A protein has these predicted regions:
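Aromatic/hydrophobic pocket-lining residues that form the small-molecule binding cavity
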Residues: 15-18, 89, 93, 122-125, ...
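Acidic (Asp/Glu)-rich catalytic clusters
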Residues: 19-26, 44-62, 94-104, 130-152, ...
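Active-site acidic/histidine proton-transfer and metal-coordination neighborhood
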Residues: 69-190
Length: 298
């Protein structure tokens, strides 16, 4: 059993997914956006490119648009933009899930959204998840025809925890569990835990071995082990409980600075459970970070 670690990579629709991945052969797994993460738009893809990637067998995770809000609006159903935003999010997620399924991606990672009324928000997130896993479109029918089976059964959605900022949902394990408990097709829904987010929220102290052990205990008390499908491996610029989402290079932030042995303890836990890890910072230290992580768990 070896550590499965990679990073977020840039993707050009002109080059195609296969070429984008081939340029980063040192990675065990990959994450990318398949459309503009901050715009109301979707990208069309060559079916041949998606199928070529599927045949490659590479471990790919796709990150959904950052402007999706599975609640529709943080202001609730009385907000004038609620219906439009909810429809956009649901339509976009269903489209992205079909693209991911055709290319054989391991999951679509999504920030769950925000709501002032957290109880209502958790219910609305679950409603949206239940909706998009069943939703059918012309694209669904086309891709199902290509694969010779209902592609909706291959949709996999990964809900990501937040840093606890303002009205954002998914700030701790109990809140994630509240959402998950309302989801119908649990076998098609997993989680992505961002270490910076968990630390910044104050609910996951990855900076101490005891905190890491506590995280695993709490997680496995709430969820089946296979529900945690991915880690976003990021250090944090902010202190524990700062409620600020600012990633930092590994061993240079408030989680693991001068604490390689604690990072090693965390990595061993992920390795033993066969959970892939993706680095998200876009700087020139990624290769060095990969080298350090692999050396720590040799």
């Amino acid at each position: 059993m070896s550590l499965c670690i990679g990073s977020h990579i840039s993707f050009s629709s002109k080059d195609g997914i296969c070429k984008s991945v081939e340029s980063d052969l040192s990675l065990d797994c990959y994450q990318l956006y398949i459309s503009n993460p901050k715009a109301f738009s979707s990208t069309e893809y060559k079916e041949s490119d998606l199928l070529s990637f599927r045949k490659s067998g590479k471990k790919l995770f796709v990150h959904a648009s950052l402007i999706y809000n599975l609640c529709g609006s943080k202001e609730g159903e009385d907000c004038p933009k609620y219906k439009r935003n909810l429809e956009f999010t649901r339509r976009g997620l269903a489209h992205d899930l079909d693209v991911c399924a055709l290319m054989g991606a391991r999951g679509l990672v999504v920030h769950v959204g925000a709501a002032r009324d957290r109880e209502w928000g958790c219910q609305k997130v679950a409603e949206t998840v239940n909706f998009v896993l069943k939703e059918r479109s012309k694209l669904t029918d086309r891709y199902s025809e290509i694969l010779g089976k209902d592609i909706r059964k291959e949709r996999t959605l990964l809900l990501e925890n937040c840093a606890g900022e303002g009205t954002k949902l998914g700030r701790d394990i109990p809140e994630l569990f509240k959402i998950w408990s309302l989801i119908e097709r649990k076998e098609q829904v997993g989680f992505c835990v961002d270490t910076c987010h968990g630390f910044a929220s104050g609910s996951m102290d990855f900076g101490k071995t005891k905190g890491i052990d506590s995280f695993w205990r709490e997680w496995e008390e709430h969820f089946p082990k296979e529900s945690l499908r991915l880690f976003h491996l990021n250090d944090s610029k902010g202190i524990l409980g700062c409620k600020v989402d600012r990633h930092e290079t590994l061993l240079c932030g408030r989680i693991w600075e001068n604490k390689p042995e604690v990072l090693a303890h965390f990595l061993e836990g992920a390795k033993g459970r066969e959970i892939p890890l993706v680095l998200e910072r876009k700087d020139n230290t990624v290769e060095k970070e990969l080298e350090i992580c692999r050396a720590l768990v040799e």
